[in-house]
Amino acid sequence: IRCRVNDPFYMNTTSILAIEDGTVVGRIEYHFYGCMQDGYRMTYVDWVYVLPEYRHKGIAQGLFKKMEKDCNKHKMNQYYLIRATNPNADRFYKHFEDVELSECPILRKEIK
């Protein structure tokens, strides 16, 4: 990951780390983008992860709250992510307030 830190391509990405006793125990990564035509501003959450032994302690919720503060600071209209499809993730996201959960198919192609 060090080689990406100074790569201009990744400069619009933000990572917030949860650190306990000097150890990174969780991370959320996101970036902002918008539509020039209508000025709508969105945040895409690329990555959310908390080490298994630190889950169910409010760490992921705290990461999302910090991200939402950053979104408010930058006047973002909404954020979205592609949810993991596992029981733990489903339970976690169902506790969010004022969100729309949907089942959306995803097409992905690796560029070679």
Predicted region positions:
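Residue-level recognition of the GNAT/N-acetyltransferase active site
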Residues: Y33, L51, A84
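Conserved acetyl-CoA-binding loop of GNAT-fold acetyltransferases
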Residues: Y93-C104
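Conserved beta-strand in the GNAT
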Residues: S15-L17, T23-F32, Y44, Y49
